[in-house]
Amino acid sequence: MRPVTSFLNRKKAPKNNGDKAEQAAEAFLRKQGLRFVERNFFCRIGEIDLIFLDQNTYVFVEVRFRANNTHGNAAESLGQSKLKKVRNSAALWLQKNNKVNNSSRFDAILFDEKIDSQHLTWLKAVF
C-alpha cells in the first residue's frame, strides 16, 4: 500500500481536456521564457486560467480547446462576455495583489483538434 504522503504530494493528473490544455499551455509559455505566477484564479466575477510574468508585464491567459469545429474553432469561442469577465477578474487580481501600477496584457492560447504544439496558437495582446 502506498504511503499517504506520496499520495498527497503526487502531481495532479488532468481530469479533462480543459485541464490538459491548461497544462500544455503552461508548459509552452514557460518554454517561451515567461515566469509562472498562478493558475485558475477564481473570483465572484469569473476565472483566469493562467497568470504569467513576461519581464515586468503581467500576462493573463485564456486557454481554449475545441476538439472539432462543430460549434466553431477555439478562437471563435472567445466571446465578448468571456473577455469582459477575464478583464474584470484581472483588474481584481491586480488590486488584490497590489500590482495595479504594473503593466498587463491579455493573451490567448488556442488548441484546435488536438492538445499538442502543432495545434497550438498563441495570440498575444488579443484583447
Curated annotation (Swiss-Prot):
Gene3D superfamilies: 3.40.1350.10. Transmembrane segments: none annotated. It comes from the Bacteria. One of its GO terms (molecular function) is nucleic acid binding. Belongs to the UPF0102 family. NCBIfam families: PRK12497.1-3, YraN family protein. This is UPF0102 protein Mmwyl1_2395. It comes from Marinomonas sp. (strain MWYL1).
